[in-house]
């Protein structure tokens, strides 16, 4: 999947603190075409992108209670495209009535020596998977509908097998901190996808 769009807002005193507003759900294989048809009608007037990404999750264990996590991913369908390094912060506690999960998000393009660099820094790969699916856009929002594949032999993404009989659905938007009105937009769009898919706030710690 592509990195979040570059913001045109001025930067003062360093980089902009970007936040991801996220809702997630799943849909059975037999419901995929109906959902894709609905998304084509609701999203921007352009053909949806397809993607096939190989993602590895790296951990750095220290004195803190939980390890520091970074994600390295590379596109399998675009040879020569850059790798991406992604950091996803812990969900903000904040107001329980907030319509989406909100977390800090950093996504940068890197060279193909990223895995070696992370290992030299002391990170160890925890797990890896392949994600294949479709990407739709609606303004600042994007909808990823994808199937997760289990990598049977480390590094051999080509032989990956489907993990389940369903597709994950992620509706997200990335924006500078403080723009909580985006959460309302994300929730409003999610309502338009019912009853095909139920998108909710899912705490990653509860599914690990």
UniProtKB/Swiss-Prot annotation:
Keyword entries, A-Z: Activator, Nucleus, Transcription, Transcription regulation
Main location as per UniProt: nucleus
Matches recorded under Pfam families: Med18 (PF09637)
Subcellular location: Nucleus
One BP term from GO: positive regulation of transcription initiation by RNA polymerase II
Molecular function per GO: transcription coregulator activity
Subunit structure: Component of the Mediator complex.
Record-stated family: Belongs to the Mediator complex subunit 18 family.
Function text: Component of the Mediator complex, a coactivator involved in the regulated transcription of nearly all RNA polymerase II-dependent genes. Mediator functions as a bridge to convey information from gene-specific regulatory proteins to the basal RNA polymerase II transcription machinery. Mediator is recruited to promoters by direct interactions with regulatory proteins and serves as a scaffold for the assembly of a functional preinitiation complex with RNA polymerase II and the general transcription factors.
Protein name: Mediator of RNA polymerase II transcription subunit 18
């Amino acid at each position: 999947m592509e990195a979040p769009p570059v913001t045109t807002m001025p930067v003062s005193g360093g980089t902009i603190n970007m936040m991801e507003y996220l809702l997630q759900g799943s849909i059975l294989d037999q419901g995929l075409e109906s959902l894709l048809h609905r998304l084509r009608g609701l999203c921007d007037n352009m053909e949806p992108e397809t993607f096939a990404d190989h993602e590895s999750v790296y951990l750095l264990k220290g004195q803190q209670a939980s390890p520091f996590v970074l994600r390295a991913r590379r596109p399998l369908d675009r040879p020569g495209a850059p790798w991406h390094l992604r950091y996803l912060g812990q969900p903000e506690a904040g107001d329980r009535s907030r319509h989406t999960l909100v977390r800090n998000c950093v996504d940068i393009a890197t060279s193909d020596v990223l895995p070696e660099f992370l290992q030299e820094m002391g990170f160890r790969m925890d797990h890896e998977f392949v994600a294949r699916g479709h990407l739709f856009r609606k303004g600042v929002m994007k909808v990823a509908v994808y199937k997760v594949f289990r990598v049977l032999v480390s590094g051999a993404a080509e032989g990956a097998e489907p993990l389940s009989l369903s597709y994950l659905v992620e509706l997200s938007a990335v924006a500078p901190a403080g723009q909580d009105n985006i959460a309302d937009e994300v929730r409003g769009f999610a309502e338009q996808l019912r009853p095909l898919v139920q998108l909710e706030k899912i705490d990653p710690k509860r599914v690990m």
